[in-house]
Amino acid sequence: MFTSNSTSQNSFFVSLKIKLSKLLLQPTFLIGVVLVIILSYLVIAPIVSIFSNSVSLTMMDAMLSGGKDGEFTYKYVDRVFTSSISEKIFWIPLKNSITVSFFATLIALTLGLILASLVTSTNILGRKYLGFLLIIPYMLPSQAMATAWLTMFKNRKISGPQGMLESFGITPPDWLAYGPLPISICMALSYFPFAFLLFSSALSKIDIQLEEVASTFGAKTKAIWSKIILPLLIPTTMSVLLLTVARTLGTFATPYILGTPAKYTLLSTSLYSSVRSNDSGVVAVIAIVLSLIGLMLLLVDIWVVRKWQRFVTVGGKGIKRQPSKLGVFRMPTTIFAWIIFLIAALGPFIVLALSTLMREPGNFSFSNFGLAYWTGVNVPGMDQPGIFTSPEVITALKNSFLIAGSASIICGVLGLLIGYAVVRLPGTLISGFLRQISFLPYLMPGLAFAAAYLSLFAVARGPIPALYGSISLLILVMVVTYLPYASRSGISAMMQVGPEPEEAGMVLGAGFWRRITSILAPLQKSALIIAIILPFITGMKELSLVVMLVTPGTELLTTQSIRFLDFGYTQLANATILIIGVVVMISVLILNRVTKTNLASGLGG
């Protein structure tokens, strides 16, 4: 009996040892489990927390009402939707958000379609360069266009230096300087490159044989576009429409900069105001509404794309599309395209740069130009150091590089690990769970996701300390927000590498980490670099995601520019935005160099 028990114990330990050795040799399952645990906490827990906050009594309200902290309540839902202040904090901002989103999306979609058609399909002058130049506004921080507009059209309604037009004796009316009109225009000019890229890509993929056949049967250009090309662009048009609406609804900078002076509130700025007033229950409800709107728009987009997948063109690729000759319209259309570039990309840079180089607005004498706002020497009416010597700017610059850099590296590595687990564990629950949960942050606008993180990490929960006010929280929220892009990139990259190289390494006795570092890492080097640089670019110009999470000492360049604007230091804000623009441009050039392509490759020329 004793021998039998001893033998069974030995066989158990031998079996356990074999399983552990297999797990160490091929720990894909273990990696998948660890990723499931980490992402469950970083993605699902904040969402659960914000839903909980929307129906839980806060400590302050509990003290005022005689209830218990955390007690179930519909108070905040009622406050947002039916109370005496609901018009101010929700219904009017919702109406304003819909109005601005409608006009901004309409302008962006129209500009994107027209310019994409001109660059990809016509002999417009400079089409080779316009393909890249027209997407520059997409690389700039969201507040660049708004601050440039403010610098140009600002009037005496708000304090600070004169606007450029006002310095020439022209006082812009309030409706032109602030409110729905400038917000809609600035949003449209910021987001039309998104439409331009999608339409350009769609147009380049349309089989040219369809147009050739129509031309053979005598169809005119107008008929070809109305009967063939535009119907084929319907899925792209719907995607542009829905995704642009989602982006405009979640944008904070432009409504804050141009809406606050006119007391024109959108949902994003109403959410921010609730955060500043420490009304966490209302914050939770508004954030949930924004998230549900984003989810609804995305589901509609998916439905439209799937529906229109039935209408595909079948056949070989025709000859390369030859640019249509515009004839007498070539010069007018060329002027139009270059004017859009001037207004949307070059214009803001010029306005921002001029404002930082002129000691007095509107004085174009040579003696008025200099680096006073950059050095802080002989600056009229400003008690702040210059950009080069400002402790706030230097700290914000360091924080931006530290936070965006750390987040991008973690995001890139995490994306490849998710890709590895998903591809190497096909058909498993772990694979399906990781694929879906890593995409979940895409459904939430930046402000709403930041509010979710604020609700989760504002206080200590078990072994996890309170992270609010720390750089760690900003890094975490950036990592999780950009994870959908990194994970999709990682999955795509890993699907291109079969298991054979790893199996060969195992035969030669290489351990798991040796196979990762010596086999997979070199094969995925380019994918990893791209997965790091793209989140870094986005992180450097991020504002909506971090504006409610930063505290003194953790300011980024984007939030510091907003602080300067709040205190009336327009020139310092503009200089800070220029620094962001330069860093982003350099990062894009590095990305182009690494990938040996560019964001507008194939669009023209």
Describe the role of every protein-language-model region.
Residues 1-34, 302-340, 431, 592-605:
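Transmembrane alpha-helical segments of polytopic membrane transport and secretion proteins
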Residues 15-20, 72-85, 369-388:
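A short amphipathic helical element positioned immediately N-terminal to and/or at the very start
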Residues 26-65, 84-204, 232-252, 257, ...:
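Membrane-water interface segments at the C-terminal ends of transmembrane alpha-helices
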Residues 59-69, 74, 212, 220-223, ...:
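Juxtamembrane inter-helical linkers in multi-pass membrane proteins
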Residues 65-66, 154, 252-277, 363-369, ...:
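Glycine-rich helix-loop "coupling/hinge" segments at transmembrane-helix boundaries
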Residues 72-73, 199-212, 221, 234, ...:
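Transmembrane helix boundary and interhelical loop/hinge segments in multi-pass membrane proteins
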Residues 122-125, 204-209, 219-222, 260-263, ...:
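Juxtamembrane helix-boundary/capping and inter-helix hinge elements in multi-pass membrane proteins
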Residues 215, 273, 506:
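Alpha-helical residues within the helix-turn-helix
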